Regions:
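Solvent-exposed soluble domains appended to multi-pass membrane proteins
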Residues: 2-300
Length: 300
């Protein structure tokens, strides 16, 4: 039978893999995970401690009157981040990973507790209106979060990204790309899966616009921007980024081709990088006996 993704997540993360969490713990950070929903989702109550998080905060740790539709608001989540920052010891370095719930799909039900403020002009897509109205609320909450940390004395870095685009009425997509969801080129398909991100600091740092990247590189970009020396694995990723600026399970951005290719279409130096990346990922996740202590040192 088939196994759910959550099952794989729980089965494979049974001891502490090398990750941003283990790397930051090794240099003295307290690592905190926050998710304003049930702790059993994706077995987070098991997986997060296995990843090395020192603290986990789930739905019972939040004010459950701060609800939009059926979910705790981004504003409440950000206030909890601020609370945890304000309660930290004076010499405590904090890494807080937060996964929000406010804008989770679907978007077709009507709610008494949500006044939708954004409407498409000339198009009747209630689900799109609801989604855009939720994003509007997220913008306000994000303004609160950044304004708060703009004014603290400690250096702070915020890495902000979504995990996927919303699932909306299929009949809406021709208005976006002129084609809908079928017959798309690899580049057009990748566009549908592309999400925005930013890294913000409350200290002076050079503004850089990355035309394209992928989530596997965000921890490396965050460490670089924070001025933290890159562990060997992140240095590998920083070097790989020069040749393969974006990669996911479907394909990768090929500089030589000037667009997205399927993984199996890679040749030459691009194929070498992808092959070595596969070897390192396997070594970190599955190779219990021969794990490279250079790339994947155990938690000290």
């Amino acid at each position: 039978g088939s196994r759910g993704l959550g099952d794989v997540y729980k089965r494979q993360i049974t001891d502490t893999p090398t990750s941003l969490v283990s790397n930051l713990k090794n240099i003295g950070y307290t690592c905190v995970a926050m998710h304003p929903y049930y702790d059993t989702g994706w077995s987070r109550n098991i997986v997060y401690p296995n990843m090395g998080f020192d603290e986990t905060h789930f739905i019972d740790d939040f004010d459950q009157t701060k609800i939009l539709r059926d979910y705790i608001t981004d504003q409440e989540l950000y206030e909890k981040i601020v609370d945890r920052y304000e309660s930290k010891k004076s010499n405590e370095d904090l890494f807080i990973m937060s996964i929000s719930m406010q804008n989770h799909g679907g978007y077709t039900e009507k709610y008494d507790n949500f006044d939708e403020k954004v409407r498409l002009l000339g198009l009747n897509y209630p689900d799109v209106n609801q989604y855009l109205s939720l994003v509007h609320e997220s913008d306000s909450a994000l303004e609160y979060l950044i304004s708060y940390f703009q004014n603290v004395d400690d250096p702070v870095e915020i890495v902000f990204f979504g995990d996927h685009q919303p699932s909306l009425s299929s009949s809406f997509y021709p208005n976006l790309n002129g084609k809908g969801l079928s017959g798309l080129t690899e580049d057009e398909l990748e566009d549908l899966y592309t999400i925005p991100f930013f890294i913000w600091t409350n200290y002076e740092s050079t503004e850089v616009e990355l035309p394209i990247t992928s989530i596997n590189y965000l921890s490396t970009l965050a460490l670089e921007r924070a001025g933290i020396e890159l562990p060997a694995y992140n240095q590998f990723l920083a070097d790989m980024m020069e040749t393969i600026p974006a990669i996911n399970s479907r394909g990768y951005y090929s500089k030589s081709a000037g667009g997205f290719l399927h993984i199996e279409e890679a040749t030459g130096e691009e194929a070498d990088w992808i092959r070595n990346y596969n070897i390192l990922q396997y070594n970190n996740m599955f190779d219990k006996k021969e794990k490279s202590e250079v790339f994947f040192p155990y938690l000290k």
